[in-house]
Amino acid sequence: IRLINQDVSNLINPILRKIVSTKEGTAGFANVAGFEVGGKTGTADQPADGEYSKKKINTFASVFPVSNPKFTLVVMLDEPKPNKEFVYNYRDGRQPYKGNWRNTAGWTTVWVTGQIIDKIGPILATKY
């Protein structure tokens, strides 16, 4: 079932790819080589007693390969806990980054998504 017009999809997909593939994007940890991943991050404050709390829900909705979409993967984490001892290995060759105080989708759900695609991508045979 097609949910959006093909012309709209053709306009949006390159933007979703840039979110993952460029240094200005917020989802570089999902830039798994050979799978042309695109996606959109989302970080939301959870409501509590009519106000917003400091608790987060982080989401990353991804599609791959963006040039000929076959799969979508949505990862949502409820109250993810950043780990100051965790070592993030960038996929673009930059030096690893140790520790994280950022509780945003770009540092939590995107990383999980990248790990999942890295493992299931070869099984799905979706390399472009």
What positions do the PLM features span?
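Conserved catalytic neighborhood of penicillin-recognizing serine enzymes
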Residues: 1-7
